[in-house]
Amino acid sequence: MPPLVSERKRHLDRRRNPFFEHAEAEYFLAWRDGEPVGRISAHVDRRLNDFQANRWGLFGFFECERDPSAAGALLDAAQGWLVERGRDRILGPLDFSTNHECGLLIEGHDLMPQILENWHQPYYRELLEGQGMAKAMDLYKWEIMERERDRVLPIIEELAERLEPEHGIRLRPMRKRNLRAEVRAFMEVYNQAWSSNWGFVPLTDHELDHMAGELKPILDEDFACVAETTDGTLAGVSLSLPDYNQVLAKLNGRLLPFGWLTALRTRRRISEIRVLALGVKPEFQHTGVAAALYRDVWDACHRRGIARVETGWILETNESMNRAMEALTGRPVKRYRIYERLLAPDAVPAFTDTGGP
């Protein structure tokens, strides 16, 4: 399912994407008989390397025909570029970081990709593993059906209502008219709640402003919520998006000349959402804030006729979140894998095998 061509061009443009203020990248194509048969990016994110104190080199945007020689040539080209820059491994796919689309889909190919989510041919796994790429980390996406509402909502409501009065928590929608400030508040929670996560890198102020501009056309206030105390202290946030891929599937990647008409008609019939993030600041964890945010998502889905919710990716090592998804009657429906190939003798594998949820 093609993404919007205009959005992909902006994302890859070194002059327009603020990611390149702290990173560099090179793009490679594989050709056979004058025809392109594959592509890959190689990139170095200095902000990631500084924050995580590592020397990771990254690859992304991997697409390839079912041809091991083409896949090998692409990975070797990316690896050579990274070795020249002193990286100790090639790790990915990340398009460009864990703040963007990441991982190779290895389970769940029968499901349509949701907004801001990659989809890959099943044979890509054998292409990468055939070139000596090993698992670094798995990411899970969970499915929760609205029809389970009557079974789960009483549990959430009990937790939320019992604890909210004690801590003076109130919920309000993110304000689209003040989106830049709302995105900064969102990232305040994000940076605190996710900072210890594997592969995490904080966004710069310029990246936050860029994100606000990208979100504004697609943000739906019904699915974006801020939790704060009565004195305005930020406690938590949740951000979900209607699955606009149900719209984009009919546009073949282009809004012009007439795709926007189809978009307007189709968006009213969107039946799924993707939870991009739901997080609580450390001092408000275990206070019912998360339960209140979960309840808000369920209530919004019920009002809008949303039948299916899919989470953003959750690290296989995040046991508390994976257990929470099970408690909400969720089931893991997609698995993404981040691979690595070590390049330096002193490089330590990032792989941690937990067995998954």
Residue ranges and their predicted role:
Residues 44-47, 249-250, 264, 269, ...:
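Alpha-helical subdomain
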Residues 118-199:
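Acyltransferase donor/substrate-recognition loop-hinge adjacent to the catalytic core
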Residues 50-132, 251-328:
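Acyl-donor binding region in acyl/amide transferases
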Residues 46-49, 98-100, 149, 209-210, ...:
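Flexible loop/turn segments at secondary-structure boundaries
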Residues 91, 143, 226, 239, ...:
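Short beta-strand segments
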Residues 1-33, 40-51, 173-280:
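A conserved beta-strand-loop-helix scaffold within acyl/acetyltransferase catalytic domains
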Residues 142-159, 337-357:
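C-terminal "cap" of GNAT-fold acetyltransferases
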